[in-house]
Amino acid sequence: MTRNSPSKDLIVVSAVCVYDDAGRLLTVRKRGTDKFMHPGGKPEPGETAAETASRELAEEVGIDVDPADLKPLGSWLAVAANEAATDIEATVFTAPGTWDAHPSAEIAEIRWLDLTAELPDDLAPLLTDHVLPLLAKK
């Protein structure tokens, strides 16, 4: 992973791939934004990447997964979806099993993606540039 350019800010985040019983991938759109992304967010002081992912998953969509049960998928540098002149350094996990999601107040909308269908054009760069190509190889 190469570092961002000096003219860009860098945000560290954790995110989680969550699937429903039809094999669709959960994406969320946060209030005041226009791109869909994984559930996830920034760490609290002292949190590991997995602890952050677990906490954010519970806060955003009501899914409780023990951090130890999250499986690392990868870490990437990507353009931030909703913040200008900003990159994200994202650690992405996969949650075991299948889930139902219930959006919290900070989530404007959830959408389940059928990975075998044509994908919408309002997805975050982390998804389109890194995660979805990796999932397509599996």
How would you describe each model-predicted region?
Residues 31-36, 103-138:
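Nudix hydrolase/Nudix homology domain
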Residues 76-102, 115, 134:
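Active-site-adjacent beta-strand/loop module that shapes the phosphate/pyrophosphate-binding cleft
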Residues 20, 24-60, 64:
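Conserved Nudix-box catalytic region and its N-terminal flanking loop in Nudix hydrolases
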Residues 11, 38, 65-67, 85-90:
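Short connector loops at helix/strand junctions that flank enzyme active sites
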Residues 18-19, 27, 94-95, 112:
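Conserved hydrophobic "DFG−1" position in protein kinase catalytic cores
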Residues 2-25, 42:
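Conserved N-terminal beta-strand and adjoining loop/helix that marks the start
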Residues 64-74:
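A short coil-to-beta-strand element that immediately follows conserved catalytic motifs
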